[in-house]
Amino acid sequence: MFLSPGEGPATEGGGLGPGEEAPKKKHRRNRTTFTTYQLHQLERAFEASHYPDVYSREELAAKVHLPEVRVQVWFQNRRAKWRRQERLESGSGAVAAPRLPEAPALPFARPPAMSLPLEPWLGPGPPAVPGLPRLLGPGPGLQASFGPHAFAPTFADGFALEEASLRLLAKEHAQAMDRAWPPA
C-alpha cells in the first residue's frame, strides 16, 4: 500500500479529498495605531453619537484615512470603555477610579510672525552682519500678504503640524543654542 502525503493512520477518515488543501493558518491582524489627529476626530464623533450610522462612519473613515471597519471596531471598543466608566462611576458602592480631567484644547491662533527669537540671522530686518543678506527671505510685508498659515509646514496628507508642538520644539532649540553659544 502506497500512501500519499497527508494520508496515514493519523489522518484516515478525516483526510482531505482530492483537490482539497490543508486549512491555512488564520491570519492575525496587527494592532492598529492611531495618530493624534485620528483619535481627536474619532473622539469628537463619539461625543456627537455613540452609535453613528454607516454613512457617518464611512465619512469619518475617509476623513481620517482609515478603513470603515477600523472605525466601526474603534466605536465598539470605545462604547465598551464608556460602559465600564459608567458602571464604575454609578458604582456598586465601591470607590470609583478617579477620572483624569481632559486636557484643555489648545487654541490654533497663530502668533505674530517670528514671535520667538531664534537666531539673529534667521529673521526679517536688517542683516546682523552688514553686506550679508538675511537667510529667511521675505520680510513681514510679504508674509502678511499670504496670510498666517501660508508657510505652515504640512504632512504629506495635508494636515498642518500642531502649532504647540512646533513652538515647544523652537523654544527647546533656542534654549539649547543659548547653552551652546553664550552671548558675547
UniProtKB/Swiss-Prot annotation:
Positions of the UniProt region annotated as Disordered: 1-33
Organism: Pan troglodytes (Chimpanzee)
Gene Ontology MF annotations: DNA-binding transcription activator activity, RNA polymerase II-specific; DNA-binding transcription factor activity, RNA polymerase II-specific; RNA polymerase II cis-regulatory region sequence-specific DNA binding
PROSITE patterns hit by this protein: HOMEOBOX_1 (PS00027), HOMEOBOX_2 (PS50071)
Domain notes: The Homeobox transactivates the Ret-1 element in the presence of CRX and NRL.
Any Pfam family hit: Homeodomain
Protein name: Retina and anterior neural fold homeobox protein 2
One cellular-component annotation, GO: nucleus
Comp. bias intervals (Low complexity): 1-10
Location within or outside the cell: Nucleus
GO biological process: regulation of transcription by RNA polymerase II; visual perception
Subunit-level organization: Interacts with CRX.
Biological role stated in the UniProt entry: May be involved in modulating the expression of photoreceptor specific genes. Binds to the Ret-1 and Bat-1 element within the rhodopsin promoter.
Entries under Gene3D superfamilies matching the protein: Homeodomain-like
Keywords on record: DNA-binding, Homeobox, Nucleus, Sensory transduction, Transcription, Transcription regulation, Vision
DNA-binding feature ranges: 27-86
